[in-house]
Every structure is written in structure tokens, then in C-alpha cells.
């Protein structure tokens, strides 16, 4: 067969992104094939070149120890707001206590952010003391403890909770990784209504399996997203 060239296709991607959970590595395969032109963009516009986020991200990518010196330059009385802080704790339980304090009080007050939607905890694991499951329960109990809700598979979902869609649902037009907020619930009929960016989506019964609390999410789930403030527990 033959075809007529009528345009071009660009395939942007992040070469340092975590590999897919499933099969396939399209971007790296295309680059390694040497059969298409490749352009590498290395100027960061989101942060300044001397940003500690930028500096430490490059260090981690190269397998080097991050620069924690910025944490020693900041005091509570300083007016200057830095973009990277390192806080050391002695054990996982203390880390959880610090996360609760930082995400609900210190960061929102100092940076004038909403603790519900502007601050995001990113954790490497689902399970464990500093895993997403435990942190979601702890954060929910502090940020949204008393709102009306329903229990589903040993998890409470309350009006006002931040939640994440866990799978693609083409009928509801919500997709894996979408963040929303519960705006209504009916415990008797096991129904939830979630406000996403463009629509309110209805869930009932087993459909609630598609949702999880999103006060804390895994690093893998966060790829492609951006947040005003991020807390990352490392043990």
C-alpha cells in the first residue's frame, strides 16, 4: 500500500518516568530504535535553575544523595519561603505524627494553602505505617472526622473527602488517577456523588470499589499530576 504524508506526529514523554505497571515501554523503545528524530528538552521552566527541588531531583536521578542543607537555613522566624525541606524523625510512628502536623497545620498556615486539596502526601507503598492506606485513615480522622459518610469494605467515605478514581470508566467518563471530592452520600442506599473537574459522578454499591481516599497516594499514581505542596515519607 502507499500513503501520502500530510503532517507529523510528536510523542512527548519523560525519559525518567517510572516504568509502566503493565507491558510496554513505548517511549524508550522508540528512542532506542534510532528510526525517528529525537529531541531532548533539558531546560526546566517550572522551577528556577537553583531551586532545591530541581537540584535534588537531578541528584536522585543520578543516584546521588540529595542536598539537605536547605533545611538548616530556614527558621520559623525567617520570612523567606524555600521550596524544599528535609525533616528527620526517629521511627515510622513519629513520621506519621509529623506528616499530620505538617499537612494540616504547618504547611497550610505558612504557605496559605488548603490542607484538603493543595497539599498531597506521596508515599512509595500502599501498606505499612507510612503507606497510603494507613496515612489516609489518619489524615481523614484529622481533616474530615465528623462529616456524614458510609462504610464500604472497611473504609469510610465521608462528604468532603478527597478521593481518586482507580480505573477507567468510559461510561461515566472518569479515568484512572482522576481526583475528586465527595459532595453527597446516602448510607442507606450506599450511594456517593463525587465532584470531579467537569462533572459530578454517581457511584452505588460495588461501583464504590472504583474509588479510594486520596489524602495520601502512591508516587506511581501521582505521575503526570502537580500539587502546590508535597510531603514524601521515606523510611
Regions found by a protein language model. Name each.
Residues 6-10:
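Loop/turn-to-beta-strand initiation segments
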Residues 1-5, 217-220:
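Conserved RecA-like ASCE ATPase "motif II neighborhood" in helicase/translocase motors
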Residues 12-163, 169-172:
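Conserved helicase motor core of P-loop NTPases
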